[in-house]
Amino acid sequence: MTKKILLVDDEPDVTFTIKNILEDNGFQVDTFNDSTTALKSYKSNYYDLVILDIKMPKMDGFELYNKIKEKDPKAKICFLTATEIYYEKFRKLRTGLGKTIDEDYFIQKPINIEDLIKKLTFIMNNKNDE
């Protein structure tokens, strides 16, 4: 069965590029360039993985993470980040739901295609809730 991914990034070039890469590797990908619209359209128990950019206007990736987890506690979510600073910040703040996120759930930009596919496959197959 085809794995379904939701990708949210405020930069259309990024969503376009990553969507094409993932679809070329057999994934079905829905994209949004606005976190508020993504949240309104989110379907619980539909996606195998959600990929969120951290730095977005209106609602950043951390806030969107918390809102998705409120709707769908078992959602597997990872983050795109241009810097490791965000990982450290998030690790210290924790999420509003009292969980910390493992470093494996952060995907560093610029993206290496092979590493991206390996990391996403690992996350989707990981039985542990992050």
Predicted regions and their residues:
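Active-site residues of response regulator receiver
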Residues: 9, 53, 81
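Two-component/phosphorelay signaling modules centered on CheY-like receiver
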Residues: 12-30
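Acidic, metal-coordinating helix/loop segments flanking the phosphotransfer/catalytic sites
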Residues: 31-49
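Acidic catalytic/metal-coordinating carboxylates
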Residues: 33-34, 60-64
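Conserved phosphotransfer cores of two-component systems
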Residues: 43-45, 67-75, 98-101
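Receiver (REC) domain active-site loop signature in two-component systems and cognate sites
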Residues: 56
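Alpha4 helix (beta4-alpha4-beta5 surface) of REC/receiver domains from two-component response regulators
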Residues: 63, 84-107, 114, 118
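The C-terminal output helix
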Residues: 118-130
